[in-house]
């Protein structure tokens, strides 16, 4: 109710780092928005694109960005120019009231967190997978989804057995049940 005074002129900002997929409050709010991403132009071909982790290339103790349009490798020294000439692009229908913005650390200005530093942090996750969660959340600005080795529900269903209600199977000491939804 703090913004009620401002009626239609109010602006509410929800700013956060995403956490666990399906549980993250900021992910839920972003999904309800028009999902804007910042597109930057390639300094070689001018094609606009999101800065995506999949396009980072580590070479000779350096990190470069491969353009999705022309395939040329872009040095980080072009980033200032790219950021200055970029624009926000909505990717979902808008309700006219809610704008959502996603920006990863790959957009950090020159002199801040570099692409090479992002690669170095990523390399540490290969040696210590427990760091993957933090890398996805804080560097990529994405939710983390843990890999699971749980069997498919059909495999569990095939193992079921039928017993009359009120009976415990022979050899059973106690009966317990659990459900994870």
Regions found by a protein language model. Give the residues of each.
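Short, flexible loop motifs at catalytic/binding sites
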Residues: 1-181
């Amino acid at each position: 109710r703090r913004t009620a005074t401002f009626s239609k002129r109010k602006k509410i900002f929800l700013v956060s780092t995403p956490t666990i997929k399906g549980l993250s409050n900021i992910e839920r709010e972003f999904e309800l928005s028009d999902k804007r991403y910042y597109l930057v132009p390639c300094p070689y071909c001018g094609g606009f694109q999101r800065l995506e982790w999949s396009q980072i290339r580590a070479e000779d103790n350096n990190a470069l960005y491969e353009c999705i349009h022309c395939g040329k490798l872009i040095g980080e020294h072009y980033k200032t120019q790219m950021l200055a000439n970029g624009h926000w692009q909505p990717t979902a229908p808008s309700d006219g009231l809610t704008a959502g913005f996603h920006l990863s650390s790959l957009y950090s200005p020159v002199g801040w967190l570099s692409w090479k530093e992002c690669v170095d942090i990523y390399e540490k996750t290969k040696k210590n997978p427990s760091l993957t969660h933090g890398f996805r959340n804080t560097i990529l600005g994405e939710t983390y989804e843990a890999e699971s080795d749980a069997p498919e529900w059909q495999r569990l269903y095939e193992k079921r057995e039928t017993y009359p209600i009120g009976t415990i199977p022979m050899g059973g000491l106690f009966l317990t049940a659990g459900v994870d939804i």
